[in-house]
């Protein structure tokens, strides 16, 4: 592995309470494990997703996901924000599927308004606490979507796509398309590679090299959606606390212009709230 220096990290240290040594250790371990995923044959890779995350948390015990304390109020605010995007697509007959449901906080909230919900994740343990009469938990290998075909009217994922190997992402999208009902839709939220990277490699590298196996632009994700068969793709950027529908062409034009800027400028301005809101990939694809 190439040498890691401390110079690239300086500009980011103000955004974290972690030491340079802790971040460097995390970086080295995550890159090692991510490379294991990237280089594994497909039949081995599907079984590796859970394994490498378990190993990361074991070898990096001060990982932010293990040490960050999130209050109930903060967790609730995050759920409310995500529901504010989804609520316009939900009615009493909605069949909802969340990919990467985690502890199920969002799915349980949607279950108050929908007919049926599926909470899908790769971890049986993390799904064990998800209990509701209208919620069914579903275990996936990272690609499979084992729910009835043509049954889901609204699917959703939040910051999941970037963690999936590009080959697996396309297969998962095909599997997802198969379970979505005619005229049903998939809402996908993922960070934009143009103001990334957004994983631990942000401290050192111009592109994601850690567990964000591939970060996307809205244009790139639209191409994937259309490749698997979705007929319509819309953008829903967030402004002043609200998600607004916007022609995808506007977002793609902004991405094109932003992408013309030198990396150093994109790095400097890409974290400004107005730029973040415009660039966050928040798309609705309709079957």
What are these regions (language model features)?
Residues 170-182:
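A short glycine-rich, Lys/Arg-flanked "PGG" loop and its adjoining helix->strand segment in the class I
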Residues 213-228:
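Short alpha-helix
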Residues 188-212:
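Short, glycine-/aromatic-enriched active-site segment of Class I SAM-dependent methyltransferases
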Residues 1-158, 170-173, 277-281:
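Conserved N-terminal segment of class I S-adenosyl-L-methionine
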Residues 159-163:
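Short catalytic micro-motifs in class I SAM-dependent methyltransferases
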Residues 95, 183-185:
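Short glycine-centered segments of the SAM/dcSAM-binding site in methyltransferase folds
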Residues 165-169, 198:
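Short N-terminal helix/helix-N-cap motif within the alpha/beta-hydrolase-1
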Residues 201, 233-287:
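A C-terminal cap/extension of S-adenosyl-L-methionine-dependent methyltransferases
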